[in-house]
Amino acid sequence: MSSDMHLFVTVGSTNFDELIKYIDDEQFHFFLRNLGFSYMTIQIGNGTYIPKLIYTNDNNINNNKLLKEVKYFTYKTNLDKYFEKAHFILSHSGAGTTLECLRKKKKILIVVNHKLMSNHQSEFANYMHSCNYLDICNNLQNLKQNIHLSLKKDTYNAFPQADAQPFLKDLYNLIYN
């Protein structure tokens, strides 16, 4: 694994304070550093927990043990630059974020938020995992192990590019036939 890797964590518009609290920990930062990560950007969405371990190399007294930089934000209108910069993405199981990451050919680990009203995210994540597009973490206690295994995994199936033609053909047939 290369050094100076960038981790992007996104929870979309949901509240996923459990995930944010879990990664806001010196041991987790140390774990990431040992895997070759130097940077972590966290999108906290609608959560109420604000990460406390936010730093750059300049204000990090443990700079040889932790990451070079950790920053966070609530929302941005466009996440493309964060997806592009990331070597690895930890994400909630939102379909939009997941599909965007897969279309950009990014390695993604879905962390299922079991506190949401229905388990549609879990169903979606399990389906995408069964197609070998990504890996999932169903329990935060296994997050480090899941990250490690996902980073070691070499082959995922390529996510197919969007093709509007079948839809347009069906729409045309509905309108004109």
Where are these regions (language model features)?
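Residues at secondary-structure transition points
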Residues: T14, T74-T77, H92, K115, ...
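Short acidic-hydrophobic, aromatic-tinged amphipathic segments that line or gate anion-handling sites
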Residues: K71-T74, L134-L143
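Catalytic phosphate/metal-binding cores of nucleic-acid and nucleotide-processing enzymes, i.e., regions
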Residues: M5, E69, N78, F88, ...
